[in-house]
């Protein structure tokens, strides 16, 4: 057989070329296959890179009173005749400080008549106020939407004349903060103006105009107890809205007591980030910085219906998010109290409520039970270190002098399980009972002894669970 050297050389060159190109082909194939699995890959690496919790509580390091930003609730516009009714005792058990209500002008028929000739009837709205007061809370009222009697179109339109809107706000404040005699009510001008009505902070449909006439009405209110007015309750924290409203307030000596926004997000760090940014922006307005309050007037893990609102997923997010707000957020309003009715007739349909619709027994969901558990934490906040990526925790001393730790393991993928070490430091040597209570009612008690000044226990925390631990001297 005759050999041809040029063929051998050519074959070698082809092999070398193939070996050089092969990695690029493999990379392209991997990319094509990987696109559909991108989220899985991200979650895998996120899971691998997360930090497990190693909780350490200094039982003698009291930081001060325990802040409770979670003691604020909101109810959306589910039904025109919604009342808390038989839910009042259950809501009262959450110890709410404020309950936010919107749709007051299009649901409760407060404004009647025609443009330029209007009257007011608060009788239907009074029932809602009665429920709020009976729950132990004060009203936080979103002044929304445009009363049909004065609107130039639908409930999201501008009024026929702005004087009617100004008078409407004035009379609302005079009724709630005057006739009803309720002190320290918050009035929030509109609800999500960037979504409901497509308001801007400039142009023909200008939220600044809406706010201006509202605060004029507030200034004209007579015979009233102390109250606060602000807004805008936008869908998220936006610097352009923040700057526009504060610049207007400073330039016009307008009353602006608080700035508000909503935040629906799975990122537990977002609330801290929001507050850091807002406080940083606020430094540019020294006239307002000493007094302006910052509120999150709706929050949850998803602004749309989501099955997690019916399960421990939403419960773990609510507690973990609340823990991350401690000492950072003054008021955050969990949305919402009760479900509306599912058009398909389901009891659980991923709605935001802590209770099902009345037609399904107004049954409490896990998020309600979790917030009740969270609120059992003691009043003296203790130093706690060692929170992880998924497991968040807070510690306090209760009235009995016992140390408590609330734990929440929120994992959006539902996979993270930890056997969380909890170390109690600066304790007296001796005998203790460790009571572990879990969302759903399961309870464990361990009797332990230590000759040292610290004690470590472990808490098994599957994904999306909440537990309350109490260390009791014997």
Locate predicted features:
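N-terminal Lys/Arg-rich, disordered targeting/topogenic segments
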Residues: 1-18
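Hydrophobic membrane-insertion alpha-helices, especially the h-region
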Residues: 20-34
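N-terminal carbohydrate-binding accessory modules
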Residues: 38-98
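Substrate-binding cleft and catalytic face of glycoside hydrolase catalytic domains
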Residues: 94-266
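Glycoside hydrolase catalytic-domain groove-lining segments
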Residues: 263-307, 330
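Aromatic/acidic polysaccharide-binding cleft in carbohydrate-active enzymes
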Residues: 301-394, 398-402
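Carbohydrate-binding surface patches
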Residues: 388-430, 464-470
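C-terminal beta-strand-rich structural cap/linker in extracellular carbohydrate-active enzymes
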Residues: 449-474
